[in-house]
Amino acid sequence: MSKRKKLLVMAGGTGGHVFPAIAVAQYLQKQDWDICWLGTRDRMEAKLVPKHGIPIEFIQISGLRGKGLITLLKAPFVILRAVLQARKIIKKYQPDVVLGMGGYVSGPGGVAAKLCNIPVVVHEQNAVLGLTNSLLAKIATRVLQAFPNTFPNAEVVGNPVREAFFSVPMPQERFNTTCETLKVLVVGGSQGAHILNTILPEVLAQLPNRLEIVHQVGSGSVENVTALYHDKVNLTQESVQITEFIDDIAQAYAWADIVICRSGALTVCELAAVGTPAIFVPFQHKDKQQYLNAKYLADVGAAYIVEQHELDAEKIAQLLKNVDKEKLLEMAEKAKNMSTPLSTQRVAEVIMDTVKT
């Protein structure tokens, strides 16, 4: 009987790195691969990965951007320690290949793999290249990207997303073009987005009889946001539902006629997978990462972009006034056409091919 192939997954820090990596890991588990994860104890992967039945090992590493002089002076020693820790784990686990999907942990892990002559596959989730992946790409066996032109010559494979996002009904089945009420989902991410929480009650006040809103406000914000809605409108259970978190975000996207949200790479690709239009409010960052992610759908007419410095209730209300169900269905179909349903499979195939060659 042939020996099971082994993959070491290196991803951490945020859901945008961790969830696509979990999708690939689970796909390969079904192909009888053995999976181990390299992460850090203080980030989300420490709790999330074991819940998905994947063993995890830890190294000590954190980000260096924006840190003080003392931290930067210590950086070479911190990185060297992390590389040695990763090398020890690799020597023990003996993977056939490692997959780097971003986050601080990928850097030391990728260097350690190269030192051990283990093939490295890199996947970049964002439209703007991350620092870790820009360095890892120089030593990688294969480089993959979610969006075109992040790397000059890498294969475009999309972002792996969970099967649940492709299992909802198609846009043509979901959109009721005779209903005047717009179902609006507002998502600020797990921490909420304060500016969206503040502005949406004002938007509803301008369109009191047109909107049905589900608003995910983030941890600890329900009471404050409920009060804001009460100040602006005669709040009813039918018009607004306010919640800290949404357990089944795929079904929530499928329920909505339009989503108002940030534009992290995973969010953009999940909305494309479901086929739901969006108003993106990109998080302001010097490299415009979220803005460029959002353009993937906005450039084909599947979404609108409102930059944060231009954001006000009147602008959002005007966008919602100007769309009818026929227009939203057209946008939804354009979003669906930009989805990459074979992304998880393709990343897994590249990993398997790397071992064969």
Swiss-Prot record:
It is found in: Cell inner membrane. Keywords: Cell cycle, Cell division, Cell inner membrane, Cell membrane, Cell shape, Cell wall biogenesis/degradation, Glycosyltransferase, Membrane, Peptidoglycan synthesis, Transferase. GO terms for biological process: carbohydrate metabolic process; cell division; cell wall organization; lipid glycosylation; peptidoglycan biosynthetic process; regulation of cell shape. Its EC number is 2.4.1.227. Cell wall formation. Catalyzes the transfer of a GlcNAc subunit on undecaprenyl-pyrophosphoryl-MurNAc-pentapeptide (lipid intermediate I) to form undecaprenyl-pyrophosphoryl-MurNAc-(pentapeptide)GlcNAc (lipid intermediate II). HAMAP family: MurG (MF_00033). This is UDP-N-acetylglucosamine--N-acetylmuramyl-(pentapeptide) pyrophosphoryl-undecaprenol N-acetylglucosamine transferase. It comes from Histophilus somni (strain 129Pt) (Haemophilus somnus).
